[in-house]
Amino acid sequence: MTAAAVTDAASSKANALKLEANALYSSHKYHEAIEKYTLAIEADPSVPAFYTNRAQCHIHTEGYGAAKQDADSALEIDPTFIKGYFRRAVALLAMGQLKEARADFREVTKRAPGDAVARKKFAECDKLYRRIQFEQAIDSEVDRKRVADTVDLKNYPVPEDYSGPRMAVRKVVRKRETQEGEEQEEVEEDEEYVDQAFVDGITEWFRNQKTLPIRYVYVILLQVDRLLRQLPSLVDVSVPADGVLTVCGDVHGQYYDVLNIFKLNGAPSSTHHYLFNGDFVDRGSFSLEVMLLFFAYKLLHPQGFYLNRGNHESVGMNQLYGFEGEVRHKYPAQGKRLFDLFQESFEALPVAHLIQDKIFVVHGGLYSRETAKNATQEGGDGVVRLDELRAMSRFHQPQHSGLLRESLWSDPQHQN
């Protein structure tokens, strides 16, 4: 339908629906507003503001892919429509596509130089984009060792005045190597580890907003990183015959919500398994506590506490939405190193779980046909197989396309 084909009656109906949608939006009823804006668009698809208004609702409900699509539609109708560029920039920024978001914010500042909000958004996006580009350039110029290989726990004793929960200690046998890499005799060492008493202790310690000694943080991260790297990218899950499995969505640093889940639903145990489906950090003020508790539970119940990686378990999102700042604030002396170590652990997280060969759990969503291994083969059906996910390379940051990207970022969008 073109603008000329829209009757006065249809236009009047569309405007009435828009007013209803605006009222719903003002009442924070975003899903209901989306429905009304959709009806308005169906009545009169020629008005770009209908699309950008719906895009704003999608942004509030974290439907960033749909928001970008609506912004694209608005700009197809009117390439000069400033709100189209702004909404698309916000959606792209939320999806971590900084280069594209930066270009759209710049376009808004050119077309509306007096828009202070747009100038501020562009400055923030530009600063973050340049910072990440600089860090990536440094990383590509040197053979950077993994942070996990550089941490020497002997340098981080538990402070004498520390009065919180303490890790248990066990004897382990390890092989030592010379500088030339030759194996030496096996040696017995003390190793701290996570037991139920420690998990119970840090649960209350964090509830009272106290921090762990950096030594214990390093121990948890080093041990969980070693554990996670042994797992496939797609983990098969069996529910205990005498127990249950609870699947939970985004917790985003809301530590007290996590405690409430365990209070109402039961704490993780050998018979009560949990699967948390990504986005553990950012936005909330206690992302570090959530992550340390989850990693501690993973060490305590390696076959009963499961963690999927989400799109917020990545560098760009953590720099944009708060986790990096939180880590640096709570551990100022070790903040940069600790944040990098968290990123290594995030990269080791599996991206999907298959429950009882029946239920597929992934943070992002299903996959585009172009992502399938056989997509370019003659007769290929464009369907991603589970074995492709099991063999997926995941020990890196998500790119703009591919299996890892879509496992974390595949927002539902309308198909033409």
Where are these regions (language model features)?
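Alpha-helical tetratricopeptide repeat
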Residues: 1-148
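Feature recognizes metal-dependent phosphohydrolase scaffolds
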Residues: 106, 123-416
